[in-house]
């Protein structure tokens, strides 16, 4: 009978104090008159919803945005009492769960708006309006028609929000176009509070801040707007273990497809991390890792559970079986890894969060993904049971 399991060999280290510092940086940027809401959807971008939410509340955050009702109920079952808004889930179906748990639905279409306004009890809600992303939200004509019908006088939204499509590019004409559309729509709903900017949008200037900004990726150290020098603290590191090391001759092929051949007699180390853990397949032959400060290139393709590293110039005592391999650090961040692979940093972060064992710098740990975190829920409060 198996009674114990050795610790995970691939660890995602998460610095909660860095998340708090990034929250304070954004708060200082927008000023005290602008509310900073934290976006913790998708399990806090893979970093652990409950842990991250608690750290943000300790830093002064009083409003959290989650992706769905499942996440909202997980927060409530974990005794998170801050205001929680749900980006997208069925109020018409789950209205009682919203009301009994003090949750705020984001209304994205006319069906949801009718359900809100037709409810016997008043329900606070945020109204999402479509300004150019072509994803979710009421179009201007729908808002105007409902305005003329008096629905917003009877049940006004607490906040009107929209989402910028091109905020990572400060000079893109879409930003001003969406600002003008948002302003035209929101003018119908005065004096409702307004929110347009997310993480990259906060760097577009005060006119985009309105009453509230919704910050996600910036909290987790991602500099999607490319601000230099980067004012955000790195939040995560990734470490794996060396499994084996071997000497090979010059001109030997390495990995699937023989995409790399040794240019000299070389020593190669095999580390137990691959695309299963969230390391992008496309970073093959493009990045370097570290052994106790020594840099060594990844050579050959990224496999499902392994990578190969040229450690010829690393002292053997530092790169033998069982030694640590550092893939992400303050010097080589998620942004850098994503750029090397030609993918979005948010994709890299969320995949690492699912594929690696999380370890928080306060010494605690958590399993990746929701099933492990649901152990925080009290008896009878499993969100999966509530929602069926």
Curated annotation (Swiss-Prot):
Pathway: Amino-acid biosynthesis; D-alanine biosynthesis; D-alanine from L-alanine: step 1/1. It comes from the Bacteria. Keywords: Isomerase, Plasmid, Pyridoxal phosphate. One of its GO terms (molecular function) is pyridoxal phosphate binding. The active site is at residues 41, 256. The modification N6-(pyridoxal phosphate)lysine is found at residue 41. It holds the Pfam family Ala_racemase_N. Substrate binds at residues 135, 304. GO terms for biological process: D-alanine biosynthetic process. Its cofactor is pyridoxal 5'-phosphate. The keyword Isomerase applies. The keyword Aminoacyl-tRNA synthetase does not apply. SUPFAM superfamilies: Alanine racemase C-terminal domain-like, PLP-binding barrel. Its EC number is 5.1.1.1. SMART domains: Ala_racemase_C. It catalyses: L-alanine = D-alanine. One of its GO terms (cellular component) is cytosol. Belongs to the alanine racemase family. Catalyzes the interconversion of L-alanine and D-alanine. May also act on other amino acids. This is Alanine racemase 3. It comes from Mesorhizobium japonicum (strain LMG 29417 / CECT 9101 / MAFF 303099) (Mesorhizobium loti (strain MAFF 303099)). The gene is alr3.
């Amino acid at each position: 009978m198996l009674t114990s399991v050795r610790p995970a060999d691939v660890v995602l280290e998460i610095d909660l104090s860095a998340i708090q510092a990034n929250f304070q940086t954004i708060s200082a940027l927008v000023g005290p008159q602008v509310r900073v809401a934290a976006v913790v959807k998708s399990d806090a971008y893979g970093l652990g919803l409950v842990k991250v939410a608690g750290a943000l509340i300790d830093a002064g955050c009083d409003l959290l945005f989650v992706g769905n009702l499942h996440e909202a109920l997980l927060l409530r079952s974990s005794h998170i009492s801050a205001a929680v808004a749900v980006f997208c889930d069925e109020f018409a179906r789950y209205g009682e769960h919203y009301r009994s748990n003090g949750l705020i639905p984001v209304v994205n279409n006319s069906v949801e708006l009718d359900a809100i306004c037709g409810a016997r009890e008043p329900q606070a809600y945020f109204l999402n309006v479509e300004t150019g992303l072509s994803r979710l939200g009421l179009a201007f004509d729908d808002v105007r028609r409902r305005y003329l019908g008096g629905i917003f006088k009877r049940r006004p939204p607490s906040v009107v929000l929209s989402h910028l499509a091109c905020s990572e590019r400060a000079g893109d004409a879409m930003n001003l176009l969406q600002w003008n559309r948002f302003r035209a729509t929101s003018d119908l709903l005065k004096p409702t509070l307004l929110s347009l900017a997310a993480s990259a949008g906060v760097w577009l200037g005060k006119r985009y801040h309105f009453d509230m900004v919704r910050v996600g990726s910036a909290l987790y150290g991602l500099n999607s707007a490319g601000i230099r020098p980067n004012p955000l603290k790195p939040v995560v590191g990734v470490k794996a273990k060396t499994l084996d090391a071997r000497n090979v001759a010059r001109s030997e092929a390495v990995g699937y497809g023989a995409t790399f051949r040794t240019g000299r007699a070389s020593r190669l180390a095999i580390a137990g991390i691959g695309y299963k853990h969230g390391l992008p397949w496309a970073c093959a032959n493009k990045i370097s890792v570290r052994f106790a400060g020594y840099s060594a290139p990844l050579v050959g393709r990224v496999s499902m559970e392994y990578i190969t590293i040229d450690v010829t110039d690393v002292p053997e005592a530092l790169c033998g079986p069982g030694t640590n391999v550092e893939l992400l650090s303050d010097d080589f961040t998620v942004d850098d890894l994503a750029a090397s692979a030609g993918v979005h940093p948010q994709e890299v972060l969320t995949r690492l969060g699912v594929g690696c064992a999380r370890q928080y710098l306060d010494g605690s740990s958590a399993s990746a993904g929701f099933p492990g975190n649901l152990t925080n829920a009290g008896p009878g409060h499993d969100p999966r049971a509530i929602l069926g």
